[in-house]
């Protein structure tokens, strides 16, 4: 039975998370992984190239050596292991899952706020602070997006929760009540 990408990413990230947490190197590892992820984001298709059967093994190893040249042992071993198992195109998913584990451990929630007009930094900070209190977490990190179709108010979305305070939704609710 073949495992899906998410299952594999969760297994690899959990193992790495446990090791670096035990060794007190979680923050450094997280920063390092985010740099690696940026390289993959800036070079779209890099993971597929490193798993492509058409590319010579020595060419793949040259790219791999560049990626791991300044890497810590743990990150270097993770990259080499994903390469050895032909899963380099899973690396960004593994890093995402590692970041999710770090956020959960630190009680950080990442959310997207959608508003009809651009929000100032002060408004975002206040909104994040209030939402963190409501969720009983240490911090809410908001990513802001503008959508004028909501008319006014805001919608805050996390992975597991949607708080919809938009005028458009309120209008729809009133309409439904009037219709019966």
From Swiss-Prot:
**Which Pfam families does the protein's record reference?**
OSCP
Q: How does it sit in the membrane?
A: Peripheral membrane protein
Keywords attached to this Swiss-Prot or TrEMBL record, sorted alphabetically, are: ATP synthesis, Cell membrane, CF(1), Hydrogen ion transport, Ion transport, Membrane, Transport
The record's annotation in InterPro entries points to: ATP_synth_OSCP/delta_N_sf, ATPase_OSCP/dsu
Q: Name one cellular component (GO) term.
A: plasma membrane
Where is this protein chiefly located?
membrane
* Transmembrane helix in keyword set: no
Protein name from the UniProt record: ATP synthase subunit delta
GTP-binding: present as a keyword of the record?
no
Can you provide one Gene Ontology molecular function annotated for this UniProt record?
proton-transporting ATP synthase activity, rotational mechanism
- Which PANTHER family does this chain map to? ATP SYNTHASE DELTA CHAIN
What HAMAP family does the record point to? ATP_synth_delta_bact
| Record-stated family | Belongs to the ATPase delta chain family.
Q: Domain of life of the organism in this record?
A: Bacteria
| Taxonomic source organism | Pediococcus pentosaceus (strain ATCC 25745 / CCUG 21536 / LMG 10740 / 183-1w)
Subcellular location(s) of the protein: Cell membrane
- Known function: F(1)F(0) ATP synthase produces ATP from ADP in the presence of a proton or sodium gradient. F-type ATPases consist of two structural domains, F(1) containing the extramembraneous catalytic core and F(0) containing the membrane proton channel, linked together by a central stalk and a peripheral stalk. During catalysis, ATP synthesis in the catalytic domain of F(1) is coupled via a rotary mechanism of the central stalk subunits to proton translocation. This protein is part of the stalk that links CF(0) to CF(1). It either transmits conformational changes from CF(0) to CF(1) or is implicated in proton conduction.
Gene of this entry: atpH
Oligomeric state and interaction partners are given as: F-type ATPases have 2 components, F(1) - the catalytic core - and F(0) - the membrane proton channel. F(1) has five subunits: alpha(3), beta(3), gamma(1), delta(1), epsilon(1). F(0) has three main subunits: a(1), b(2) and c(10-14). The alpha and beta chains form an alternating ring which encloses part of the gamma chain. F(1) is attached to F(0) by a central stalk formed by the gamma and epsilon chains, while a peripheral stalk is formed by the delta and b chains.
């Amino acid at each position: 039975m073949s495992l899906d990408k998410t299952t594999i990413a969760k297994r690899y990230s959990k193992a790495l998370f446990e090791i670096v947490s035990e060794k007190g190197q979680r923050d450094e590892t997280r920063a390092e992984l985010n740099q690696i992820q940026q390289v993959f984001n800036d070079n779209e298709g890099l993971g597929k190239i490193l798993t492509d059967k058409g590319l010579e093994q020595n060419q793949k190893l040259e790219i791999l050596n560049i990626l791991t040249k300044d890497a810590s042992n743990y990150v270097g071993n993770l990259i080499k292991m994903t390469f050895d198992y032909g899963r380099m195109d899973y690396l960004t998913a593994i890093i995402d899952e590692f970041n999710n584990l770090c956020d959960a451990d630190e009680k950080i929630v990442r959310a997207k706020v959608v508003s009809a007009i651009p929000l100032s930094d002060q408004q975002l900070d206040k909104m994040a602070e209030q939402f963190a209190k409501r969720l009983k977490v240490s911090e809410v990190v908001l990513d802001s997006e503008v959508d004028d179709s909501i008319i006014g108010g805001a919608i805050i979305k996390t992975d597991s929760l949607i708080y919809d305070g938009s005028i458009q939704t309120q209008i729809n609710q009133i309409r439904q009540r009037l219709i019966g």
